[in-house]
Amino acid sequence: MEQKKLKQLLSEMSLREKIGQMIQLTGIYFDDDAVLTGEVGEDQPPQWVTQYAGSVLGMIGAEKLRGIQKKYVEAHPHHIPLLFMADVIHGCRTIAPIPLGQACSFHPELVRKMARHAAAESASEGIRATFSPMIDVSRDPRWGRIMESFGEDPFLNGVMGTAMLRGYQGEEGKDPAGNKKIPESGIAGCLKHFAGYGAVSAGREYNDVEISQRTFREQYLKPFRMAMHADPAMVMTAFNAVDRRPVSGNKELLEGTLREEMGFSGTVISDWGSIGQLEEQNVVSSQKEAAEAAVRAGVDIDMMSPAYMFHLEELVKEGSIPTSLIDKSAWNVLVMKNRLGLFENPFAGMQGEEPLSAEAKKTALALACESSVLLKNDDMLPLKPERKVFWGGPYVESRELLSRWAIFGRYDDVETIREVLKARKMPVRFLPECEILTEEERRLWQAENCRIQDSGEQDKEIPEICVNSGKQYATLDEIEPEDTVVLVLGEHEAQSGEAASRAFLDLPEGQQKFFDAVAGRTSHIVTVILSGRPLDIRKIAEKSQAVLFVWRPGTMGAEAVVRLVYGEETPSGKLSVSIPWCVGQVPVSYWDVKTGHRMVETNPENRFTSRYMDIPNEPLYPFGFGLSYTEFTITPPIFEKQEREDKIDISCKVKNVGEVPGAEVVQCYVETLCAPVVRPDRELIRFRKIFLLPGEEQKVKFTVNRKELAFYGENMELIDGDVQFRFIVGNSSRSEAGSILYAF
């Protein structure tokens, strides 16, 4: 629709119609089978709200949504279409690894490609907007939502978030009137959670955030600044407060920082109920005040709180807020719908890609392989196909390779590891399965409430893992000291995700006992770990000859595990988040700021240093770390001839000196050598994943904009000169191939 006609439409809409565009309801008000991802209050929306609500979340199914849309558009006075949204976090029907795992691929183009498949599958089922990507920097694995993040590094979050966003929104063009258009096979993306939510205190869900303005702006806002280049359709407000001011009522942050400073021009949507929760946070005394605070702050859509639906109309009529605020927010929603082409075709995209296409599964498999990180390998992997091996652990026969956020994924789309091994006729034997969780743990984690769709109309519970009397199992007593055992262990999917904070990061009790029993029979153990977060795996690593961390790998997870273990694929993942030595270290990250009383290698026993007395300072495995089945060398960096004063060109060479093809991630970090404020130890500023054949060498060139080196000074002024930096290249945050100094 032309801008002129869109403005005319807005001018003709009634107050209730405009407010309706600012209200998002859950699908349960339209269909009984809608997916709930939050709490529903006791107050039912007024009839006019369900008639005029601008968007709905948690519904899927082209035929169903087509019927709802048709009825809604016909009944609406101005025939404005609904916008169906959902949490498509790491795939719609074809499920990719969790975002934390995807970041370990260090392959943004593959992440973009997978997001395109997710968008096409979503659009074909009627979903035209997703609440993803989440680019909350997170250093605390106790926080369950770290699984949705791209990890602890601001730059990596920005790169991966931008790639995923571009995948969702597709190759945007323009209509004849010059309006930006998301293709029918695309969906509107949403950057979240703005901002600082990954820094919740103690890793506890929905908790407060206490960080300095300098850290907030330099680390936690950086991914959002970077992703603005991809023109996000939406930004979601965080539950938390920043500097004790809840985001959903923070005009300075939403209007000043997000819109004016960052240049965001899309739609701001609240998280589920966060506007109403302003009252719980005691910054307002009523839902009416909450509605006024949020609309003045610039929140365009109220997701599932009573504030807007019950109080905005009254606030306008009594003169407490001007109609211009309503017009502004309603306009932002209409522009987003126009960008999606819904005015021309309210059913746009509903006849698109079939789910689980060969290409989608191929991409999901590639991403599952590249997301997996080989943490330890004492000449154990890869296994030879003809080698007799025992396989055990609850995930050998489980289809639970998805996650709590794979809300439209189906277990019957997932092969088990046992099925993959059997299909290849490998000489393997299977050990009796232990449960993923004990009964007590299942009650604690409410695992019985963790549900996912099957191929029918109804949901089904996560299947129990139990010994099938029709299958042949070996006993632990049959394991000899020289035998090799592959154990596939990990968290239950209910143990990570939203509302899944953990104080302890150990494996479930029964699995740890199972591991110890096997370790009592043989030392030749390969441990494959599935998880939505870093775990405390120190005891596992000590008794394993190889450790492969595969996160929650998705639909093609079983195939990926088998390929990696037997060397059909070479591991190339690098950690997007540090694996702590133990939970006492967290929050932990490689970019911690420098301190006095630094611990030095030449005097490790010095008590009066910044150290733990009972554990190392360093994590068990640092950010950027990951092994391969081949070896690489990286030369020290050099400066290229400077073509422009505002750019710095740094290059090095990487060579595969091993015997098999593989990929290395060359990482470039920058260290500020002297500044008026304390700076991070180092910061990732560029990376490049290079695939090389044995003996092959390739030059890697990094171009860095000088403005990227700027930081905030004593009075929060930007410092962009008279500073010396050290650029470091290597293959992890703690591995240096060389460095070079630069001053500007």
Predicted regions and their residues:
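Glycoside hydrolase catalytic-domain context in secreted enzymes
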Residues: 1-714, 719-735, 744
